[in-house]
Amino acid sequence: MSEVDLYNLAPMFQLMAVGLAVAALPLAWWLWKQRSATPSQRLRALTLITLFVTFDLVLFGAFTRLTDSGLGCPDWPGCYGSATPIGAKVEITAAQTAMPTGPVTHSKAWIEMVHRYLATGVGVLILSLALMTWWLRRQQIRAGQTPDPLLHPVWPWFTLAWVCLQGAFGALTVTMKLFPAIVTLHLMFGVGLLAVLMAQAVRYEGAAARAVPAGLRRGLWLAFVLLWVQIGLGGWVSTNYAVLACPDFPTCHGQWLPAMNWQGFDVWRELGMTPDGQLLPFEALVSI
């Protein structure tokens, strides 16, 4: 597939319709269940629904990664210019015939596209959350009321900007052919989106902030940083296919300090390559 073909916006409106369909059921359920709730309760419920669907999306993204389906449809946002693998049956069959165990097969194409459908649905839910916050706040202002601080639009619109950036990384993951740094950032932004939505849901509870001892606060921040480092390292292992570089545990090839090559931590390089275009040595995978 040529560089020109990597982005094909022809199926964009069809994919947007699919995203609306994915979001329609949870939105309908939310409207019915929260029809008599207060504004903050309605927003909290919608945030929790969005959080649940986003968590499912992250899990399915991991499944997409584990099944090596990230390039099941090698263009973006559709699949060979179609909204579903059905419309790309001829192209997928040709690719699968040429490489039966390659990156493009019918099953991998469906896995990748379902991941994109879920991502589009999450985008619709987050857009709905931002628009609902704006509308409820506007209604209070029109009624001459002091706007509820919980209805401040900064959080929802920040979340919307975040998910748009996450979508951009999702596109680059495909068009840059699983470039390790991009795939790792895509993972971390996905986990970060979960954290942002959780913080937003807690905020809508309206609970008063509690004082935290300085020592505990420092410990929590340290744990937070270590958690993100570990998530990043785990993503780097996965994106570089380095998980089996050490087949034993807790040693590596029977050694506590095996031979290592730190080129594995050169960030800006293609998959399996060094920054100067050479094949990445096995010792680099061991170091990762």
Regions found by a protein language model. Name each.
Residues 1-11:
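Short, strongly hydrophobic alpha-helical membrane anchors
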Residues 10-18, 110-128, 180-195, 284-288:
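Membrane-interface loop-to-helix entry segments
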Residues 42-47, 147-160, 216-220:
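Membrane-interfacial loop-to-transmembrane alpha-helix junctions, especially the N-terminal start
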Residues 46-68, 226-237:
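N-terminal signal-anchor transmembrane alpha helix
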Residues 26-37, 130-140, 199-208:
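Structural signal for the C-terminal ends of transmembrane alpha-helices
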Residues 2, 66-113, 243-286:
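Extracytosolic (periplasmic/ER-lumenal) interhelical loops and adjacent juxtamembrane/interface segments
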Residues 140, 147-210:
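Long, hydrophobic, well-ordered secondary-structure blocks that form the structural core
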Residues 13-32:
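Hydrophobic core of alpha-helical transmembrane segments in multi-pass integral membrane proteins
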